[in-house]
Amino acid sequence: MRQLALTLAASIFTLVAAPAMANTPDEALVIAQNIDDIVTIDPATAYEFSSGEYVTNTYDQLVQYDAVDTEVLAPGLATDWQIDAENRTITFTLRNGVTFHSGNPLRAEDVVESWRRVLVIDGRPAFILGNLGWTVDTFDSMVSGEGNTVIVRWSGDFAPSFVLNVLASRPASVVDIETVRAHEVDGDHGHAWLNQNSAGTGPFSLISYRPAEVLTLQRNPDYFAGTPTMEKILISHVAEASTQ
Protein backbone atom coordinates (compact mmCIF):
# COMPACT_ATOMS: atom_id res chain seq x y z
CA MET A 1 0.00 0.00 0.00
CA ARG A 2 1.41 3.40 0.93
CA GLN A 3 3.77 2.35 3.69
CA LEU A 4 6.87 3.05 1.62
CA ALA A 5 5.59 6.49 0.72
CA LEU A 6 4.86 7.24 4.35
CA THR A 7 8.31 6.12 5.43
CA LEU A 8 9.85 8.46 2.89
CA ALA A 9 7.57 11.28 4.01
CA ALA A 10 5.58 11.95 0.88
CA SER A 11 8.06 10.69 -1.65
CA ILE A 12 5.04 10.55 -3.95
CA PHE A 13 5.90 14.17 -4.70
CA THR A 14 8.47 13.96 -7.49
CA LEU A 15 10.12 17.12 -6.26
CA VAL A 16 13.48 18.50 -5.20
CA ALA A 17 14.11 19.52 -1.60
CA ALA A 18 14.86 23.20 -1.19
CA PRO A 19 17.25 24.81 1.28
CA ALA A 20 15.66 24.91 4.72
CA MET A 21 13.65 28.01 5.50
CA ALA A 22 14.27 29.94 8.67
CA ASN A 23 12.41 28.53 11.68
CA THR A 24 11.41 25.41 9.74
CA PRO A 25 10.73 22.55 12.20
CA ASP A 26 13.13 19.60 12.07
CA GLU A 27 10.28 17.32 11.05
CA ALA A 28 9.28 19.46 8.08
CA LEU A 29 10.15 18.80 4.47
CA VAL A 30 10.64 21.95 2.38
CA ILE A 31 10.24 21.47 -1.35
CA ALA A 32 10.69 23.80 -4.30
CA GLN A 33 8.53 23.20 -7.33
CA ASN A 34 6.71 25.09 -10.01
CA ILE A 35 3.11 24.92 -8.77
CA ASP A 36 1.58 27.67 -10.87
CA ASP A 37 0.03 24.99 -13.08
CA ILE A 38 -2.55 24.37 -10.36
CA VAL A 39 -6.01 25.57 -11.34
CA THR A 40 -7.91 23.77 -8.60
CA ILE A 41 -7.17 21.41 -5.70
CA ASP A 42 -10.72 20.10 -5.37
CA PRO A 43 -10.33 16.38 -6.22
CA ALA A 44 -13.50 16.53 -8.32
CA THR A 45 -11.87 19.02 -10.68
CA ALA A 46 -8.10 18.74 -10.15
CA TYR A 47 -6.47 17.77 -13.42
CA GLU A 48 -3.00 19.30 -13.44
CA PHE A 49 0.26 17.54 -12.58
CA SER A 50 0.89 19.39 -9.32
CA SER A 51 -2.72 19.29 -8.13
CA GLY A 52 -2.75 15.57 -8.87
CA GLU A 53 0.21 15.06 -6.54
CA TYR A 54 -1.61 17.05 -3.87
CA VAL A 55 -4.74 14.91 -4.23
CA THR A 56 -2.66 11.72 -3.99
CA ASN A 57 -1.30 12.82 -0.61
CA THR A 58 -4.54 14.09 0.93
CA TYR A 59 -7.22 11.72 -0.39
CA ASP A 60 -7.75 8.00 -0.88
CA GLN A 61 -9.72 5.79 -3.23
CA LEU A 62 -11.32 2.38 -2.69
CA VAL A 63 -8.39 0.78 -4.47
CA GLN A 64 -4.95 2.29 -4.94
CA TYR A 65 -1.76 1.62 -6.82
CA ASP A 66 0.76 -0.23 -4.70
CA ALA A 67 3.58 2.02 -3.46
CA VAL A 68 6.25 -0.52 -4.43
CA ASP A 69 4.80 -1.90 -7.67
CA THR A 70 2.67 0.78 -9.30
CA GLU A 71 1.22 -1.71 -11.78
CA VAL A 72 -0.49 -3.59 -8.97
CA LEU A 73 -3.79 -2.49 -7.44
CA ALA A 74 -3.98 -2.86 -3.68
CA PRO A 75 -6.68 -2.31 -1.06
CA GLY A 76 -7.27 1.31 -0.15
CA LEU A 77 -10.45 2.42 1.57
CA ALA A 78 -11.84 -0.99 0.59
CA THR A 79 -10.25 -4.05 2.16
CA ASP A 80 -11.55 -6.42 -0.49
CA TRP A 81 -13.90 -6.69 -3.44
CA GLN A 82 -15.90 -9.40 -5.13
CA ILE A 83 -16.68 -9.61 -8.85
CA ASP A 84 -19.89 -11.33 -9.89
CA ALA A 85 -19.92 -14.34 -12.22
CA GLU A 86 -21.00 -12.23 -15.19
CA ASN A 87 -18.22 -9.67 -14.68
CA ARG A 88 -20.79 -6.87 -14.49
CA THR A 89 -20.79 -5.96 -10.79
CA ILE A 90 -18.12 -5.35 -8.15
CA THR A 91 -19.01 -5.34 -4.46
CA PHE A 92 -16.55 -3.52 -2.20
CA THR A 93 -16.18 -3.92 1.55
CA LEU A 94 -15.07 -0.71 3.28
CA ARG A 95 -12.22 -0.64 5.75
CA ASN A 96 -13.32 -0.31 9.38
CA GLY A 97 -12.14 2.53 11.58
CA VAL A 98 -11.15 5.00 8.86
CA THR A 99 -11.79 8.66 9.66
CA PHE A 100 -11.60 11.84 7.62
CA HIS A 101 -9.38 14.76 8.59
CA SER A 102 -12.43 16.20 10.36
CA GLY A 103 -12.74 13.10 12.53
CA ASN A 104 -15.93 11.99 10.78
CA PRO A 105 -16.04 8.25 10.07
CA LEU A 106 -15.89 6.92 6.53
CA ARG A 107 -19.31 5.76 5.30
CA ALA A 108 -20.60 4.16 2.12
CA GLU A 109 -22.53 7.39 1.54
CA ASP A 110 -19.26 9.32 1.33
CA VAL A 111 -18.03 7.06 -1.45
CA VAL A 112 -21.24 7.17 -3.47
CA GLU A 113 -21.82 10.90 -3.08
CA SER A 114 -18.18 11.77 -3.81
CA TRP A 115 -18.48 10.08 -7.20
CA ARG A 116 -21.85 11.67 -7.86
CA ARG A 117 -20.35 15.06 -7.02
CA VAL A 118 -17.72 14.61 -9.73
CA LEU A 119 -20.42 13.99 -12.33
CA VAL A 120 -22.61 16.87 -11.14
CA ILE A 121 -19.77 19.41 -11.13
CA ASP A 122 -18.67 18.01 -14.51
CA GLY A 123 -15.12 19.34 -14.42
CA ARG A 124 -12.27 18.24 -16.66
CA PRO A 125 -11.68 14.83 -15.02
CA ALA A 126 -15.37 13.84 -14.95
CA PHE A 127 -14.97 11.93 -18.22
CA ILE A 128 -12.82 9.37 -16.38
CA LEU A 129 -15.79 8.19 -14.30
CA GLY A 130 -17.97 8.70 -17.35
CA ASN A 131 -16.02 5.91 -19.06
CA LEU A 132 -18.08 3.50 -16.97
CA GLY A 133 -21.30 4.79 -18.47
CA TRP A 134 -21.98 6.86 -15.37
CA THR A 135 -23.92 10.07 -15.85
CA VAL A 136 -26.00 12.18 -13.51
CA ASP A 137 -29.08 10.40 -14.90
CA THR A 138 -27.77 6.81 -14.79
CA PHE A 139 -25.76 7.00 -11.58
CA ASP A 140 -28.43 5.81 -9.14
CA SER A 141 -29.03 2.66 -11.16
CA MET A 142 -25.32 1.84 -11.32
CA VAL A 143 -23.87 2.72 -7.91
CA SER A 144 -25.25 2.06 -4.44
CA GLY A 145 -23.93 1.91 -0.90
CA GLU A 146 -25.17 0.78 2.47
CA GLY A 147 -23.44 -0.06 5.72
CA ASN A 148 -19.85 -0.96 4.87
CA THR A 149 -20.63 -2.07 1.31
CA VAL A 150 -20.48 -0.23 -2.01
CA ILE A 151 -21.81 -1.89 -5.17
CA VAL A 152 -20.62 -0.74 -8.59
CA ARG A 153 -22.06 -1.56 -12.01
CA TRP A 154 -21.03 -0.27 -15.42
CA SER A 155 -22.09 -0.25 -19.03
CA GLY A 156 -19.82 -1.28 -21.89
CA ASP A 157 -17.73 -4.34 -22.59
CA PHE A 158 -15.07 -3.57 -20.02
CA ALA A 159 -13.09 -6.06 -18.02
CA PRO A 160 -13.40 -5.58 -14.24
CA SER A 161 -9.70 -4.70 -14.22
CA PHE A 162 -10.47 -1.59 -16.27
CA VAL A 163 -13.19 -0.59 -13.80
CA LEU A 164 -10.80 -1.03 -10.88
CA ASN A 165 -8.25 1.19 -12.58
CA VAL A 166 -10.89 3.88 -13.08
CA LEU A 167 -11.78 3.66 -9.39
CA ALA A 168 -8.12 4.05 -8.47
CA SER A 169 -7.92 7.34 -10.37
CA ARG A 170 -7.82 10.72 -8.65
CA PRO A 171 -11.39 11.78 -9.54
CA ALA A 172 -12.56 8.65 -7.70
CA SER A 173 -11.14 10.09 -4.47
CA VAL A 174 -13.50 9.97 -1.51
CA VAL A 175 -14.34 13.22 0.28
CA ASP A 176 -16.00 13.84 3.63
CA ILE A 177 -19.36 14.60 2.09
CA GLU A 178 -20.92 15.84 5.35
CA THR A 179 -18.20 18.46 5.79
CA VAL A 180 -18.23 19.44 2.13
CA ARG A 181 -21.99 19.95 2.12
CA ALA A 182 -21.73 22.08 5.24
CA HIS A 183 -19.51 24.47 3.28
CA GLU A 184 -21.60 24.66 0.13
CA VAL A 185 -22.20 28.21 -1.10
CA ASP A 186 -24.66 29.15 -3.83
CA GLY A 187 -24.94 25.58 -5.05
CA ASP A 188 -21.18 25.13 -5.65
CA HIS A 189 -21.13 21.70 -3.92
CA GLY A 190 -18.39 22.94 -1.60
CA HIS A 191 -16.02 23.62 -4.50
CA ALA A 192 -14.76 27.00 -3.27
CA TRP A 193 -14.14 25.60 0.21
CA LEU A 194 -12.25 22.58 -1.14
CA ASN A 195 -9.96 24.93 -3.02
CA GLN A 196 -8.69 26.15 0.34
CA ASN A 197 -9.22 23.10 2.56
CA SER A 198 -8.92 19.32 2.44
CA ALA A 199 -11.63 16.84 3.37
CA GLY A 200 -9.99 13.50 2.78
CA THR A 201 -8.65 10.49 4.64
CA GLY A 202 -5.12 10.72 3.25
CA PRO A 203 -1.74 10.75 5.02
CA PHE A 204 -1.64 14.55 4.97
CA SER A 205 -4.18 17.35 5.35
CA LEU A 206 -4.02 20.90 4.04
CA ILE A 207 -2.97 23.68 6.41
CA SER A 208 -2.91 26.52 3.90
CA TYR A 209 -2.71 27.20 0.20
CA ARG A 210 -1.72 30.42 -1.52
CA PRO A 211 -2.00 29.89 -5.29
CA ALA A 212 1.32 30.08 -7.14
CA GLU A 213 3.09 30.76 -3.81
CA VAL A 214 3.03 27.98 -1.23
CA LEU A 215 1.09 24.89 -0.26
CA THR A 216 1.48 23.55 3.29
CA LEU A 217 0.45 20.10 4.50
CA GLN A 218 0.47 18.49 7.93
CA ARG A 219 0.54 14.80 8.71
CA ASN A 220 -2.56 12.87 9.61
CA PRO A 221 -1.72 11.03 12.85
CA ASP A 222 -4.76 8.80 12.39
CA TYR A 223 -3.97 7.63 8.88
CA PHE A 224 -5.09 4.04 8.50
CA ALA A 225 -1.85 2.95 6.79
CA GLY A 226 0.41 4.47 9.45
CA THR A 227 1.49 7.93 10.58
CA PRO A 228 3.80 9.73 8.10
CA THR A 229 7.35 10.40 9.24
CA MET A 230 7.33 14.11 8.43
CA GLU A 231 5.17 16.42 10.50
CA LYS A 232 4.79 19.02 7.75
CA ILE A 233 5.48 19.50 4.07
CA LEU A 234 5.96 23.00 2.66
CA ILE A 235 5.84 23.22 -1.13
CA SER A 236 7.19 26.57 -2.21
CA HIS A 237 6.67 27.82 -5.75
CA VAL A 238 9.87 28.25 -7.74
CA ALA A 239 9.35 29.00 -11.40
CA GLU A 240 12.76 28.14 -12.84
CA ALA A 241 14.12 24.62 -12.60
CA SER A 242 17.66 25.98 -12.22
CA THR A 243 16.72 27.66 -8.92
CA GLN A 244 15.18 24.55 -7.36
Each predicted region: which residue ranges?
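Aromatic- and charge-enriched surface segment that lines or borders ligand/interaction sites
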Residues: 80-125, 151
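Sec/Tat signal peptide C-region and signal peptidase I cleavage site
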Residues: 18-22
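Bacterial N-terminal signal peptides
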Residues: 7-16
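N-terminal lobe/hinge region of extracytoplasmic solute-binding protein
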Residues: 32-85, 116, 197-203
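Short helix-initiation/N-cap motifs at beta->coil->alpha
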Residues: 137, 199, 234-244
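Surface-exposed binding/hinge segments that line
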Residues: 93, 131-183, 208
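Short, well-ordered beta-strand elements
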Residues: 26-35, 79, 89-91, 111-115, ...
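Gly/Pro-rich hinge or "lid" segments in bacterial periplasmic/extracellular proteins
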Residues: 66-67, 168-228, 242
